[in-house]
A protein has these predicted regions:
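Conserved binding/recognition cores within well-folded domains
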Residues: 2-112
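Structured alpha-helical
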Residues: 118
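Mature exported/compartmentalized surface modules and terminal targeting/interaction regions
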Residues: 2-3, 124-130
Length: 130
């Protein structure tokens, strides 16, 4: 019998205490606290998960399969290839070329990631701006 709160509507498993199970390889799972994730990047058929410890973990699932698990935990889809933990966004700025936007993440990651034009409104809304 399934315990309440241990799976999502799409059947993906949640680890205890709100942790996320990364699928590192077939038959190998690792629990991680979503707050420790800075961003998730699509890399072909799988996904790269960048953590607070500045490690990159590989999840064998595509980004679209992980997305619903993270959107309800404060992550934003900022680009077709990226989900970003809003709690780790340090700065949002226009790109030097003009119209497009980018964001910079907190240390120790300090990565600069693109923000697609279609994601700008949702980004401002997440921070309570118009």
């Amino acid at each position: 019998m399934r315990k309440p709160g241990n799976s999502t509507s799409n059947g993906a498993a949640l680890a205890p205490a709100g942790r996320l199970l990364l699928h590192l390889a077939p038959g190998l799972r690792q629990a991680i606290d979503p707050d420790d994730i800075f961003f998730v990047e699509a890399t072909g058929d799988d996904t790269r998960v960048r953590t607070r410890a500045a490690r990159a973990l590989r999840d064998v699932r595509p980004l679209g399969e992980i997305e619903p698990l993270l959107l309800r935990r404060g992550f934003l889809r900022t680009h077709r290839n990226y989900l970003v933990n809003a709690r780790h966004i340090r700065q949002v700025r226009r790109r030097p070329a003009g119209e497009d936007w980018e964001l910079k993440l907190d240390p120790p990651v300090n990565r600069v990631l693109p923000v697609s034009r279609g994601a700008v409104a949702a980004l401002w809304a997440a921070f309570g701006e118009d």
